[in-house]
Amino acid sequence: MGLLDLPAPVFAWTDGVLSGTLPPLARLALWALLISALSMALYALLSPQAELKRLKTEMRAARRALHDHDGDFDGVKTLAARSVGLSLRHLRLVAPAALIACIPVIMLIVWLAKAYGPAMTDSGLPLDMRVTGGDAKLRVVTPGREPDGAGSGALLAVFGADGTFIAQAPLSPRLTRLEKRRWWHWLAGSPAGYLPPDAPIDSVQVHWPRYETHAIGPAWLRGWETPFLALAVVFTLTIQAVFRIE
């Protein structure tokens, strides 16, 4: 589990409770509202709102003075320099709070990509499985069943070209890639685990069908990304306007 995965159990529990009463699209809308409110609240608390209000007044005055200037070029340079300086100061004031406020959003997106990304097939088997960076044999095994039979508790077992066991992982839509641990996994971990460092292959890529949260529009619009991101933007702008957050 990486740092961005820390709130994942809370997200999963909450989504599980909501799933009893709300369809996927409604849950995504609720997630978008909650995360928008949280991120804007963090931004408002961490940013110097009073100073930003004064600064925006100065910025408007500087732009107006530049627009209305009818003198020599030196005067234009002075007014332009002041306008740019105020804009850079504004960026310096909002950047730290904005970056911190983005962290909960990123954490939720990381979880949504795993929870609402791939979908289980009717057979329980993925659409395709590929090995990269070497040669290996893949076998789907369910305890109590014949090899290559899918079902509850199915495992994906990875063997070397010589038949040596390498690794295994639960076969579910959470397993989209089985690879060696990389430096970026301290941020976002692999829910399926990792290949051993000395494995003769680089990764196993497992392809599942895309989970569709609604039936509106073409297939590429039916995933979780479009409704969640669109609603998050709308909710964020609405909250900013209603509460007059600078």
What kind of feature is each model-predicted range?
Residues 16-44, 217-230:
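Hydrophobic alpha-helical transmembrane segments
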Residues 12-15, 103-124, 239-243:
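Juxtamembrane "helix exit" motif at the C-terminal ends of alpha-helical transmembrane segments
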Residues 44-57, 229-246:
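Juxtamembrane interface at the cytosolic side of transmembrane helices
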Residues 81-117, 218-232:
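Transmembrane alpha-helical segments and their cytosolic interface motifs
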Residues 45-95:
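Membrane-interface amphipathic helices and adjacent TM-edge segments
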Residues 122-206:
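Beta-strand-enriched, solvent-exposed domains that form extended recognition/catalytic surfaces
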Residues 48-62, 112-132:
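Alpha-helical transmembrane signal-anchor/signal-peptide segments
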Residues 9-21, 193-225:
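Short, aromatic-rich amphipathic segments at membrane interfaces
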